[in-house]
A protein has these predicted regions:
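A short acidic, Gly/Pro-enriched loop at the edge of an enzyme's catalytic core
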Residues: 70-79
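Glycine-rich SAM-binding Motif I of class I
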Residues: 26-30
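S-adenosyl-L-methionine-dependent methyltransferase catalytic module, highlighting the catalytic core
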Residues: 93-101, 105-140
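A short SAM/SAH-binding and catalytic strip from SAM-dependent methyltransferases
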Residues: 79-90
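Class I SAM-dependent methyltransferase "Motif I" SAM/SAH-binding loop
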Residues: 22-24
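Conserved alpha-helix/loop element of class I SAM-dependent methyltransferases that forms part
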Residues: 1-15
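Class I SAM-dependent methyltransferase SAM/SAH-binding core
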Residues: 31-68
Length: 140
């Protein structure tokens, strides 16, 4: 598991209700479910990633956080996690506000865009690189 996921897991208390927004293949969800005994749900925009999660026995719905977080009641989760996904949204402020509304606590992580290799790639190619931690194209 990525070091970042271990840090996130340390911030979450056992047996709490968690929503993982942009949960990808469900790696963090699996870890929290098995090691923290969380009641965890996921929201993911990619149909194939949703299917991967469901195949692992995880509860995930397909949806776009910019629109679909509005369907969740206020403070319906103890924690809402947004890991390495904020940069993909057209309206990140809206998403952050929805995270804070839906969860009692929000945990948000972002890629380190200051890392010299990422900056060099951006300078030379004009796009963000595709890496192990950012495997999808999310930029225009």
């Amino acid at each position: 598991m990525k070091n970042e996921f271990q840090v996130i897991a340390e911030l979450i208390e056992k047996e709490k209700k968690v929503l993982d927004v942009g949960c990808g293949d469900g790696t963090l969800m699996e870890f929290l479910k098995n090691n923290k005994k969380t009641n965890i749900r996921g929201l993911e925009i990619s149909k194939s990633k949703v299917q991967e999660c469901i195949a692992k026995g995880l509860t995930v719905i397909e949806g776009n956080a910019e629109k679909d977080l509005a369907q969740f009641p206020d403070k319906s989760f103890d924690y809402v996690v947004l890991s390495q996904t904020l940069q993909a949204f057209l309206n990140p402020e809206l998403v952050i506000n929805e995270l804070l509304r839906v969860g009692k606590k929000a945990i948000v992580t972002i890629p380190n865009f200051g890392y010299w290799r990422i900056r060099l790639h951006l300078l030379l190619k004009g796009t963000m690189p595709i890496t192990k931690t950012l495997p999808d194209e999310w930029y225009n």
